[in-house]
Amino acid sequence: MADQSNSSNWRFETKAVHAGFAGDPTTKAVATPIYQTVAYAFDNTQHGADLFDLKVMGNIYTRIMNPTQDMLEQRVAALEGGIASLALASGQAAITYAIQTIAEAGDNIVSAATLYGGTYNLFAHTLPQYGIEVRFADYRKPESFEVHIDAKTKAIYCETIGNPLGNVTDIGRLAEIAHRHGVPLIVDNTVPSPYLCRPIEHGADIVVHSLTKYMGGHGTTVAGAIVDSGKFPWAEHKERFRRLNEPDVSYHGVVYTEALGPAAFIGRARVVPLRNTGAAISPFNAFQIMQGIETLPLRMDRICENSLAVADFLSSHPKVNWVNYAGLPSHPDHALVKKYMNGQASGILNFGLKGGRQAGTQFQDALQLFTRLVNIGDCKSLACHPATTTHRQLGPEELKSAGVSEDMVRLSLGIEHRDDLIADLRQALEAA
């Protein structure tokens, strides 16, 4: 069993396998245990009271914490370089809770407009129903975020690599802007995963994930996570972040910045939005995600190799009108891929056919190896038409703002042999 005492010095690949679990000291089991329990016994009455007052650490109820979940949280935090993380039932829950931890009715956040369709709907339609305004900016122009910031702004939000557009955001520049105004930068790092990019190293304060995708990697398990860098000075901005700096009457007056210090944000995320609205991850799902993470580096290398090979093939095909993959030197965001991701742009690729929407439909229906579905980040290669699936609820102007065209086909490359993938694409293009 691995000795965790030197784990901070481990390379990424080693952390992916060992971080967060050193083996069971009682049974000597080396596989992650699944603690399938609802609640946990208190040593005595005072122990229970101290747990509920956040005076001591420990387990209370699986809606807010679980030992299997805790192992996953330690691993994700180690891979992202944060002080702690919170695992949740889905990526959407992670995004929602990251915002609800610091924002309330009357507040706003500033976000890139190029977002995953589910996130865009959350920001454009659901959060405003709760009084939280989302102001959209152009990821290509960091200064466009700054003009939207005011005294009620609680965060800047972006995706490292956008889904489905595949665009790359200059997170370092956004971090500078956010910090100049005393607000945190929240980054969705789902598409590159921490293997390709660690946003905290470039100034991000909070990282969110749909662990369903590349981290889990096998299309079996829905999960999400929030990672806290522990670096944002919440206590220095008491007026802007009152919920972290004033007594919480629901916890007998605890002040999170005083009780939890650098972990104030992630602590409140657990004991307020998670406790009160309950998007808890199941122990079995936490176990599944941990298994997936063990092979993350191997999968991401193969996925990136396949994606570049497919992008090169599509770029030279006469029926393809355009190809959008940031791993190509011709892509306008390629310099950012080199800066933040060592030249590897993950597995999201999109392109358009010269026959437009009809040709795209014929192409998708002719696929034999690629699976037609809306997930990404699987070991299997996947294809979808965003305008009629992931972004179907968006109107024409919203589609344009999100960078989604009617002829766009999105591919999520897996780990199959590249020659087989290209052969399937070739025959489907011939049928289109």
Give the label of every model feature segment.
Residues A39, N44-T96, G118-T126:
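Conserved N-terminal alpha-helix of the aminotransferase class I/II PLP-enzyme fold
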Residues T277-A280, N285-Q291, T295, D301-K380, ...:
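Conserved small-domain helix->loop->beta segment predominantly found in fold-type I
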Residues A2-S8, A16-H18, A22-P25, S85-S316:
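Conserved PLP-enzyme active-site core in the AAT-like
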Residues A2-D3, I83, A124, E133, ...:
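PLP-dependent enzyme catalytic core of the Aspartate aminotransferase-like
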Residues V227, N350-G352, S412-G414:
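Short hydrophobic/aromatic beta-strand micro-patches
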Residues M1-N59:
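N-terminal glycine-rich, Lys/His-bearing helix-loop that initiates the first secondary-structure elements
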Residues A39, S229-F232, L353-G356:
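Short loop segments at secondary-structure junctions
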